[in-house]
């Protein structure tokens, strides 16, 4: 049976256990908001500016450890999300941005607020440099697959934001519900990176041979929900652990093996200890400038 794309999108989000959608109303997303108004599981939180909506979705994702969802209007609406989306990108926070766009039958006719500096209806190019992937849904029947891929990609591997730019008429199109049903079989599953056994063996050998090893933990530990595993590892190996700013909470700062934070806002004691380490195992960190005092030798 054929049903509205917007209604089926809402049902998909419900099945993914999405709780909140953060956004700001615009005429290009009216059909989706209409479908959302009938949901008993999803709550829409409206903001006065899309930047705040994106930042709220970012904060939600950090706490809940799953993708935050942003809904925005075309043109100025999507442009206002840039700072919030970029923040999520740099901190590896999963986010799905659903942006309304001009109707597909108006592409290239210079309709109100169309982004068309380099090509027709190209607003997805605005976020392209700061998202893991950006889609424009040119075919309504592609929506189920794109929406499912978007959540998988946002939450898999190194998490981050993704964008789905949806022409206004696609929300109101009708497609066979079987197309969405196919995504329900395994849609909650995501792919997490795994360490090759040979690499794990090499790391273990280095730690065993080290005289003063240190484990340096970052925000990736929290994103992966691996705090308990990290705690078990450092206690089993009896190796002290330092942390980054984003790694706060990976292990309690009162744990006897916790050295504290490194970098610009780190402790002198921590810096001295890590400077004397002969092997440092970095877990869930990129060794960013703020966490390594501009990569100053010995810090």
Predicted region positions:
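N-terminal alpha/beta PP-like core and its mobile active-site loop of ThDP/TPP-dependent enzymes
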Residues: 1-299
